[in-house]
From Swiss-Prot:
Homodimer. This is Anthranilate phosphoribosyltransferase. SUPFAM superfamilies: Nucleoside phosphorylase/phosphoribosyltransferase catalytic domain (SSF52418), Nucleoside phosphorylase/phosphoribosyltransferase N-terminal domain (SSF47648). It catalyses: N-(5-phospho-beta-D-ribosyl)anthranilate + diphosphate = 5-phospho-alpha-D-ribose 1-diphosphate + anthranilate. It comes from the Bacteria. Its EC number is 2.4.2.18. Mg(2+) 1 binds at S91, E224. InterPro entries: Anthranilate_Pribosyl_Tfrase, Glycosyl_Trfase_fam3, Glycosyl_Trfase_fam3_N_dom, Glycosyl_Trfase_fam3_N_dom_sf, Nuc_phospho_transferase. It comes from Vibrio vulnificus (strain CMCP6). Anthranilate 1 binds at G79, N110. Keywords: Amino-acid biosynthesis, Aromatic amino acid biosynthesis, Glycosyltransferase, Magnesium, Metal-binding, Transferase, Tryptophan biosynthesis.
Length: 332
């Protein structure tokens, strides 16, 4: 371990294996907190490479509680958080809408670290059981089309890094690992990142982790597809990364100011999302969710973004997605 940390002190990059070894030690609670802080700081200042991120993610997945992985195509739709904009819970809402459009989604999330209301805060407010067993969660994906995996239940070892992270009060590699360590191991993923500098490296990381099809996005300051500006996309298809830019017009929607999709605390967000999923959402709110569902649908082979967007809007207006929220709340 000393050799690995010394390598970081010299601003040298670790191999995937070395990174996996380092994070394995962290997750098992075997690394001295001072050395852990030093390693996390050195990685941050140097800038984490796809090899280092993939190695860390593999270490966390190897130490996670097991999950009965489906053998069909299924996805996660998730943002790193930390974009500082406190928008409504777009990816969580999009998960239900995507399921109502016929996709399978196993969403991995946590309580909010930076925004007023993280995905689990919202689900909690709808009465959805966050401590659902792995078996019940799997049957929800099978039968309802959507389920939620609560990170602490599967990744108990992350607690060993918590005091160090809280004391450091700065972003570390852990801030980007969450979306990469879904214990269900989906083969399709739409991941939003808080900085456009992360788009390409995270796509390269996903390629190393064997994703079948995925897209990493940054939307003009947001960790999701934007309706207030351009969205930078790095999409993995057939083992190759394609980079392109999308505008609201590509989805057939109007441009809206960021203020139009501001969120609040869990109760306010619950009211907004309930309206959205029962046909009472504003045009901006409907568009914001629909463009994210549309890109996720593309990853399942539905290539027409405008048709996908319209289907997502129709599903929200029909109330079909809200029925899935209720079903998941009754599930277990």
């Amino acid at each position: 371990m000393e050799a690995i940390i010394n390598k970081l002190y010299q601003q040298a990059s670790l191999t995937e294996q070395e990174s996996q070894q380092l994070f394995d030690t962290i997750i098992r609670g075997e690394l001295d907190p001072i050395l852990m802080a030093s390693a996390l700081t050195a990685l941050k200042i140097k800038g984490e490479t796809p090899d280092e991120i993939a190695g860390a993610a593999k270490a966390l997945l190897a130490n996670a509680q097991p999950f009965p992985r489906p053998d069909y195509d299924f996805a996660d739709i998730v943002g790193t958080g930390g974009d500082g904009h406190n928008t409504i819970n777009i990816s969580t809402t999009a998960a239900f809408v995507a399921a109502a459009c016929g996709l399978k989604v196993a969403k991995h999330g946590n309580r909010s670290v930076s925004s007023k209301s993280g995905s689990s805060d919202l689900l909690d407010s709808f009465g959805i059981n966050l401590a659902m067993s792995a078996e019940d969660t799997r049957s929800a994906v099978d039968n309802i089309g959507v389920a939620f995996l609560f990170a602490p239940q599967y990744h108990s070892g992350v607690k060993h890094a918590m005091p160090v992270r809280q004391t450091m009060k700065t972003r570390t590699i852990f801030n980007i690992l969450g979306p990469l360590i879904n214990p269900a191991r989906p083969n399709i993923e739409l991941m939003g990142v808080y900085s456009q500098e992360l788009v390409r490296p995270i796509a390269e990381t996903m390629l190393k982790m064997g994703m079948k099809r995925a897209a990493v996005v940054h939307g003009s300051g947001l960790d999701e597809v934007a309706i207030h500006g351009d969205t930078l996309v790095a999409e993995i298809k057939d083992g190759v990364i394609h980079e392109y830019t999308l505008t609201p017009a590509d989805f057939g929607v109007n441009t809206h100011p960021l203020e139009a999709i501001k969120g609040g605390d869990p109760e306010e967000n619950k009211a907004i999302i309930t309206h959205l999923l029962t046909g009472k959402g504003t045009e901006a709110q409907l568009s914001a969710v629909a463009v994210n569902v549309a890109l996720l649908m593309r990853l399942f082979g539905h290539e027409d973004l405008k048709a996908n967007t319209q289907q997502a809007i129709d599903v929200m207006n029909s109330g079909k997605a809200y029925q899935l929220v209720e079903k998941l709340a009754q599930h277990a």
